[in-house]
């Protein structure tokens, strides 16, 4: 066969890693003015969301989060959750988004098992998160998300989400993953027959 023993090398001309991060990169360039977030009185376009994501990624990096680190999230379907889903993979870090209905003991196990380096938590769930952190024994960076459209709650973190964003760079230079099979998210099963099981999603898997 003519191609026997040969292999086409990957290069920028014939290959790019599949990743949801590339969607944000494109929409910021092509349609920055289109609406991206509608949450109560909050309205943001894709240009604004992209800048917030870059600020978040930059600020987390400044706090020591790097490629391969797990960043946990406890929040409902709010704008900050979308930003975490896009910003954390910009660093090559892994998003661990948790079901807000889980109890403290289960969250504690997930934080420990997933080796979370940071936790972003909506203050609506701060009581549960506080107990989970206590049970896990992990000393990690905690960021309070104060959802202006939600009921709110006690602050338990070192700083708020908005304070964290203020520390970030809106022009943060991020790249796509070197390998599309790199981990993007760490999800957990319900643990029906035992402890929750970790399930890793790759950049490619999340894309497809």
Give residue ranges: language-model regions:
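Flexible, non-catalytic linker and terminal segments flanking ANL/adenylate-forming cores
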Residues: 1-17
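Conserved AMP-binding A3 loop
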Residues: 45-47, 184-208
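Structural core segment of the AMP-binding/adenylate-forming
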Residues: 62-63, 90-166
């Amino acid at each position: 066969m003519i191609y026997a023993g040969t292999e086409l090398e990957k290069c920028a001309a014939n290959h790019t890693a599949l990743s949801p991060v590339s969607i944000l990169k494109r929409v910021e360039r092509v349609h920055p003015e289109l609406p991206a977030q509608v949450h109560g009185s909050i309205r943001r376009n894709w240009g604004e969301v992209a800048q917030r994501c870059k600020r978040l990624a930059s600020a987390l990096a400044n706090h020591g989060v790097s490629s391969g680190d797990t960043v946990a999230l406890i929040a409902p379907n709010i704008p900050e959750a979308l930003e975490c889903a896009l910003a954390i993979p910009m660093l090559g870090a892994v998003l661990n988004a948790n079901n807000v209905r889980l109890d403290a003991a289960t969250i504690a196990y997930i934080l420990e098992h997933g080796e979370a380096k940071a936790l972003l938590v909506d203050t609506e769930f701060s009581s549960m998160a506080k107990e989970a952190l206590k049970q896990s024994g992990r000393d990690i960076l905690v960021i309070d998300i104060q959802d202006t459209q939600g009921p709110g709650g006690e602050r338990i973190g070192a700083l708020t989400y908005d304070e964290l964003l203020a520390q970030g760079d809106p022009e943060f230079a991020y790249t796509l993953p070197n390998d599309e099979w790199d981990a993007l998210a760490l999800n957990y099963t319900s643990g029906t027959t035992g402890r929750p099981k970790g399930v890793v999603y790759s950049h490619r898997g999340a894309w497809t």
